[in-house]
Amino acid sequence: SLHDALPISGETHGSCIGACLVYSGNFVAAAQKDQKNQTRFQMGIHPTNFCFHLEKGEAFDTPQAILSYSGTGLTKLSQQYHEIIREHICRGAYKHAKRPILINNWEATYFDFNEEKILKIAEQAQKLGIEMLVLDDGWFGKREDDNSGLGDWFVNEKKMNGSMAQLAEKIHRMGMKFGLWFEPEMISEDSDLYRAHPDWAFAIPGRVPNHSRNQLVLDMTREDVREYLLERLTTIVHDAKIDYVKWDMNRSVCDVYSHVAAQNRNGELYHRYVLGVYDLLERFLAACPDLLLEGCSGGGGRYDAGMMYYSPQIWCSDNTDAINRLSIQYGSSFFYPISTVGSHVSVCPNHQTGRVTPFRTRGDVALAGSFGYEMDLNKISEEEKEMVKEQVAAMHEYYELTHEGLYYRLTGLKKQDFMAWEFVAKDQSRALLTIVKTDAEGNMLPVHTKVCGLAEDKLYRCSLDQEVRLGRTWNRAGLTLHQVLGEYESIRVEFTEVK
């Protein structure tokens, strides 16, 4: 080719500028170069359907953006974002506190559960070292499927064989914490709430509303809607002594029409919706200051720094396939700290893709995040139960390293037949490197990967073969696996400072 080399920055070289919007609504990010060869960048509220009316003396606060620069590539840029979000965006009781390893019942039962099933899942999980049981969708109202019940935040005591406080007490007596799923911003047309307050839902008069997951969106711009939700959520959390809440949002916002807003202010509704969500979250967390809140939006649909101000971890994707998660978590790492990445070991064949992945690999991928399980542990083999114990122990051993350490992407997405990443302690005393083989080929060559971030003049022992080398040698020579990894197999390698 005769064209000039592309001025592309890499992980460890080149100038990089990042912009991260602290906002959870409609947004635009655009870059353009003018006739004087100057680049102009914009980021903020999307102008489509946005018009905010200000009276004399009123002010409007625009969303903030976090800007960062690195002269040494994308890795440094990401590490700077990880630090600022972890230290200056995330807050609350779990900003730095160790978060419990959880098991969620969703992929184990979906809507088909009762108290007995949930307690059996909890009992087995507790035996294997898991610290919290999270009860997902289906515990409230007449919610036997996704066609009804949203908005009726009252415990279905017939289904649960008693109150939520009774179930929570049984879980707590096992020595486990207990969490609940909510989807506060949504409403089912087949619900007592909708029958009582149809005007609380976004819907354009005279039109059939757009449904997604068989539900509508509540008008979060309304104070009466937020007051109802705040009373229901705080009552349940306080009565049952709930330790954790998963705050879900399983559809996008459309049909934006409020029955109480003036017609000339319809252009404010999308933005006021976001402000209403923030207001509810702020008051909810003020009423429940010891709560761990995990955000979710069909997975990562609202995975942003605005939500991280309220939830220090967000369910990264409803796709729990370990191989798909490699690219999902890779992309998330460019801006967001690994401590914010909700990641679980799920059942195989995977419920989203049908793929069969080794249990060990599923654990290694989930360790690059908050870590938990999404399955019925009573239905796995004894060998897999031993792996659960090992994975739980590994999470405790490496928790500070994965949640507070420096993160390195060692591979891209398409350049090789494996993916690798590394965590390095801030004092450079240890590092954890993980490799996952993504493609098998005939006559496979040994995997060779970079090693990054070790102190140049310190000696490090590699757990793979106990070889000791200077950090500068590992950093330059990298690591070669002499054992052959099969497709979807993984390995963890630790480097420990020799003192």
Language-model segment annotations:
Residues 52-71, 488-496:
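Short Pro-Gly-centered flexible turn/kink motifs
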Residues 412-455:
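Carbohydrate-binding surface patches
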Residues 360-409:
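Catalytic cores of secreted or luminal carbohydrate-active enzymes
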Residues 161-163, 195-197, 201-358, 370, ...:
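Active-site neighborhood of glycoside hydrolase catalytic domains
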Residues 439-499:
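C-terminal beta-sandwich/jelly-roll accessory domains of carbohydrate-active enzymes
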Residues 57, 103, 133, 171, ...:
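Conserved, mostly hydrophobic/aromatic
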Residues 94-231, 244:
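Aromatic-lined carbohydrate-binding/catalytic grooves of carbohydrate-active enzymes
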Residues 2-6:
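Short, small-residue-biased leader/transition segments that mark boundaries at the very start
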